[in-house]
């Protein structure tokens, strides 16, 4: 059975666990006498082999407040690990990423609160998530979560960060707890029609998102608020096709051969000079993508697709047009002859005539007719960056080929 094959690949071995424990031993020594806990998928037993990010939360009394976490707590943590390979990262507040033996450990300052619904910062709920999941999943359930995570990774809908807008690890765990197993999740997801409500607890507010899973530890929060409709639809379609024809391709998509360039494709390579929060950068990138598409359409280009991918330092924006060539002049359609606005139209336009349909027309010159210039002008990044741009001829870049292909490998 395919799921058993996949599980053999993704389930950590005892050797893997020992390797993680050795790394944690180093961290435990550094955080000695602090109130800290290992959280996340490693603690819950739902982590995937070779996906070895570990979450360690250092808790401080809730009375010290959020500002204390950003300054005092962070400095305390840095002083304890400063001789190790570490970098600063940014979410709601800064935290530290330590790299030991190619294992990333996120050390996150948080506030110790009485319950999940009393959280002051988003991460304060984490220990309650851990307790909820570990008390509702047995060993088989943890394997079912692993299968669901790998399936979602394979089809590109895993990850709650703004760049992906997909399912979080916690969301996959709740789906398994609610439906019972991997296959059952797919059976139900294949029939989804939004809005979809999955209630492990009664919600404490009205949610408007397409997929609603009230958080069992804080019912005022929707666990899947960040999941885009595109990713919900992709997951539902993938579930339907997997149940019809199970294949390892859903879990581990193959790389396809070179895809033909259709239309004209502009590639914009952005290299960011400054470090910033991933969600902040990707919020600006997504706004840029939308702005580029709107502007090109406004100037008369027929846009096929605009997408972006990359990390927080190197980002690619791909713009696919039916054609990059567009006339310097265009037909401007005016009002009907009996309209009260014809005088205004005549005053503002040249080369005016009355059409056979009784409507006024004119010829106007486009303010801008170079697609590359328009695209560059509509990038709205607030950090400094360098940009390289070119029109695609051919490529061996897997991400660009994926962009050109459009169709996921599991679909066809």
Curated annotation (Swiss-Prot):
Keyword list, A-Z: ATP-binding, Magnesium, Metal-binding, Nucleotide-binding, Nucleotidyltransferase, RNA repair, RNA-binding, Transferase, tRNA processing
Entry cofactors: Mg(2+)
Domain of life (superkingdom): Archaea
Pfam families listed in its UniProt record: CAA_C, NTP_transf_2, tRNA_NucTransf2
GO-annotated molecular function: ATP binding; CCA tRNA nucleotidyltransferase activity; magnesium ion binding; tRNA binding
Binding site for Mg(2+): 53, 55, 106
EC number of the protein: 2.7.7.72
Keyword Oxidoreductase: no
Broad enzyme group: transferase
Annotated residues for binding of CTP: 41, 44, 129, 149, 158
GO biological process annotation, one example: RNA repair
Record-listed ATP binding positions: 41, 44, 129, 149, 158
Catalyses which reaction(s): a tRNA precursor + 2 CTP + ATP = a tRNA with a 3' CCA end + 3 diphosphate; a tRNA with a 3' CCA end + 2 CTP + ATP = a tRNA with a 3' CCACCA end + 3 diphosphate
SUPFAM superfamilies (UniProt xref): Nucleotidyltransferase (SSF81301), PAP/Archaeal CCA-adding enzyme, C-terminal domain (SSF55003), PAP/OAS1 substrate-binding domain (SSF81631)
Description of how the protein assembles with itself and partners: Homodimer.
Record-stated family: Belongs to the tRNA nucleotidyltransferase/poly(A) polymerase family. Archaeal CCA-adding enzyme subfamily.
Function: Catalyzes the addition and repair of the essential 3'-terminal CCA sequence in tRNAs without using a nucleic acid template. Adds these three nucleotides in the order of C, C, and A to the tRNA nucleotide-73, using CTP and ATP as substrates and producing inorganic pyrophosphate. tRNA 3'-terminal CCA addition is required both for tRNA processing and repair. Also involved in tRNA surveillance by mediating tandem CCA addition to generate a CCACCA at the 3' terminus of unstable tRNAs. While stable tRNAs receive only 3'-terminal CCA, unstable tRNAs are marked with CCACCA and rapidly degraded.
NCBIfam families: cca_archaeal
Note: A single active site specifically recognizes both ATP and CTP and is responsible for their addition.
Stated name of the protein: CCA-adding enzyme
